[in-house]
Every structure is written in C-alpha cells, then in structure tokens.
Amino acid sequence: MSGTLSQGSSPARLTLWEEENFQGRRCELMSDCSSIRELSGFRRVRSVKVESGAWVGFEYPDFQGQQFILEKGDYPRSTAWSGSSGYRTDQLLSFRPLLCANHSDSRVTLYEGENFQGCKFELSDDYPSLPAMGWASKDVGSLKVTSGAWVGYQYPGFRGYQYVLEQDRHSGEFRKYSEFGTQAHTNQLQSIRRVQH
C-alpha cells in the first residue's frame, strides 16, 4: 500500500541509490520498506532524493536504530541527512513515509515527567533552543503530538539524535522517552521543529 499523505496531496515517493552522488543502482519507494536489502538487493543506501512527501530513514532494517528525517530534496551523501547531528551513519537500510502531512496547525505538548506529569509546555512553532524559550530542563519525560509531525533533537540548534514524533504513531502519545525511537537512550530533548513538506 502506498503511503497516503492527506486529501489532495500526491503520494509519497522516494528514490534511493546504492552509492553517493546518485550513482550505482537505484530503487523507488512509495510505501514502507523494512529492508532495502531484501527489496532491491542493495547492500546499503548512500544517496537519496525525496520526490514528494516526507520520509524517515533508519540506520538498520525493520525501522531500527537512529532515525533521520528526509524532507523534499536531494541528499547526495550521508552528511546531507545527518547534518550537524553529531551522530553519523553512512547508510540507511529501512524507510517509511510520514502520513500526517498537514502541518498548517502543528501542535505538541511537552511534559517534564513520564505519563504526562509535571510541568508542561505547549508548542506550535519551531524552537531551536527549548531552554532559551523557557523550558527549565534539558529533559522531556513524555509528550503529546496533537497534530502534524515534529522532529525533536537531543541538543539545541537541531543537533544530536533525531526523534521523529507523529500524531499518527502511538496515537500521538509518547508516555516515556523510550517511545521517541528505538535509539532513545536519554530523555534529553532540547530543540524541536515541525516537519516540512
């Protein structure tokens, strides 16, 4: 089944290459792919072009490991998708489209403690530094995505581990930091932004 974004939008489409700079064999995706090795025989994916929609690329098969948000555009090498994250991987092995593409009214609520306890902070815009905007801690224990999709980052300035947080996953409720992603080993979340299409 192809990833559907929202009424009136085109289906998600992603083109992958086995080597950097769009070289070598290529493969096109329009829906979830739990293992690019099994689907195409690729050893790894080293360059990506997002034709439409937004996608999440994962370091390992079965949507495991570090997540990288892939918004519309070209990613000729791994530094293009990992940016200044501080965490680098030279390959992506599984992919899925984001299904909630209407970000005109994106909203998320951060909570200090697990299970939506403690101080809360409601957001509807990008925040390159949560501490600078009034969040008293560098940690987020839980969060609720009311609408849209967000990328949370471990450090200010949209750096560090990336956590893709969608209303359509966990019903938008992330009761503890380990639900942010399979690689979430800390509840440090210090910057957050809306996914762009």
From Swiss-Prot:
It comes from Macropus fuliginosus (Western gray kangaroo). Gene3D superfamilies: Crystallins. InterPro entries: Beta/Gamma-Crystallin, Beta/gamma_crystallin, G_crystallin-like. One of its GO terms (molecular function) is structural constituent of eye lens. Homo/heterodimer, or complexes of higher-order. The structure of beta-crystallin oligomers seems to be stabilized through interactions between the N-terminal arms. The lineage of its organism: Eukaryota, Metazoa, Chordata, Craniata, Vertebrata. It comes from the Eukaryota. Transmembrane segments: none annotated. Residues 12-52, 53-99, 106-147, 148-196 form the Beta/gamma crystallin 'Greek key' domain. Crystallins are the dominant structural components of the vertebrate eye lens. The gene is CRYBA2. Belongs to the beta/gamma-crystallin family. Keywords: Eye lens protein, Repeat. This is Beta-crystallin A2. Residues 1-11 are annotated as: N-terminal arm. Has a two-domain beta-structure, folded into four very similar Greek key motifs. Residues 100-105 are annotated as: Connecting peptide. One of its GO terms (biological process) is lens development in camera-type eye.
